[in-house]
Amino acid sequence: MFYFSLHINYCKYLPRFQSLAVNLQSILYNAQIMSLTSIASKFFLPRQHELERYFTQPEELQKEVLHYLVSKGCNTEYGRNHLFSSMDSYDDFAQNVPVNTYEELKDDIDRMRHGETNVLWPGQVKWYAKSSGTTNDKSKFIPVSPEGLQNIHYQGGKDVVALYLRNNPQSRLFDGRSLILGGSHSPNYNVQDSIVGDLSAILIENINPLVNLIRVPKKRTALLSDFELKRDRIAHECLHKNVTNISGVPSWMMSVLVRVLEISGKKHLEDVWPNLEVFFHGGIAFTPYRKQYEQLITSPKMHYMETYNASEGFFGIQDDPDDSSMLLMLDYGVFYEFIPVEEVGTPHPTIVPLEGVEIGRNYAMVITTSCGLWRYEIGDTVRFTSKKPYKFVITGRTKYFINAFGEELIMDNAEKGLAYACEKTGAQVSEYTAAPVYMDANAKCRHQWLIEFSKDPDSVEHFRDLLDQQLQTVNSDYEAKRFHDVTLQKLEVVVAQKGLFNEWLKRKGKLGGQHKIPRLSNSRKNIDELLEMNKEKLV
């Protein structure tokens, strides 16, 4: 009876079924032509329009963010102690809330980790990002609230895609897989009421399950703590996938990609993943690695897009492929303030909100976020290149510098000097660190650079001379101290064995994840350890 009834109904509605079939065929055909990316791109259009306010109303956006943060903070112990309920303006906020380092918030964060609620942010915060820091820093545990997770970190990821698709309308980004290279959890730091891990591990753990359909590697592989094992498994798992985009820290991603080529026997990555089109990178400067990536990926359609994301938040995105500066993200639940670098550490530094910054000046960044960080010194330094919209470049870290003799050498100077020397000599630098030699047996002072080359210069001496010359060009204080070799002698370059820096990190249990090499330091502790290891035969 059922089949008979079905047949009668089929005959009765045959014209409609035929019409529906034609429509379905048309939809499927158009979907094949349009690609999944073309369809998905439409979901990003509203946000692309919202981002126009960054050009027209940037200061207003920041006022809205501050109002939101203070109103939420009223319901916390910190807010009550600092009179949040009586605040009506930025001046009230600046007057009542002190600038904080991690050490000044640590006791409150420790209480939150043990389950106390409404301390720095309303409710209970379960997740904590273990800050990578340097190899000799004590760990920091940065709270990641549900609001911060969604409205800062995940929103940053969405906006990266929105801006990329805006700039590349022919993209096929969603027609393949995303290779996302992350860190791991840190169970040894867990307490009963909280979970600790690298930020990237927290993001993978909490990501929308639908994203896992287009993400590689498998979750259990992505969260492995043994980087060498993780690298090998990622390479094998992703080898035969249609990878269209990769995301991660340039140094660690390079290690994975080299392994992929070793296993595949191919020379270039486009021979493995012909549809690879973009690398979303952040965490460290990309300049020292660009040439290496261009050698591994020779496809003219390959794009590179920088992001500024950290355990504390997601702050910037490169919105123009022809401009290396990044757009400051203004509506994420992050309120920004800035301290002129030369005033960092002074008793009463000048602190300005966004509208008070000057183009070309170096600032240390202070953030207030929906994760409960109130006027928090993040330790990064930036320089604005534009105010319409607000765009900037990262110039270094407040603790990564050499100023042993008044030369005030920062990471931005170092990166420019290395890029110039590499360009002129054809060399490629994979890792480096530098520190002062305060006085040798001949009473001479200089900077000592330990450099691991992925491609050696023809002459290390020529490379050294070019680096020294360029540092004088970009830093007048260094130039003055180098004048006639009176204060500073010409810098020294020591060539590191291949793999030295990774072996150093490995011995400290910090290989992979978000761990970084400290580039510049007034202290010789790191470089002396590395120089001693450099005497060993590592391979």
Walk through the language-model features, giving the residues of each.
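Active-site diphosphate/adenylate-binding microenvironment
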Residues: 60, 64-128, 139-144, 151, ...
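Short, Lys/Arg-enriched N-terminal segments with co-localized hydrophobic residues
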Residues: 19-33
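Active-site glycine/GP-rich loop and adjacent strand/helix microenvironment
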Residues: 3, 31-85, 92-100, 108-111, ...
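Conserved helicase ATPase motor motifs in RecA-like P-loop NTPase domains
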Residues: 129-135
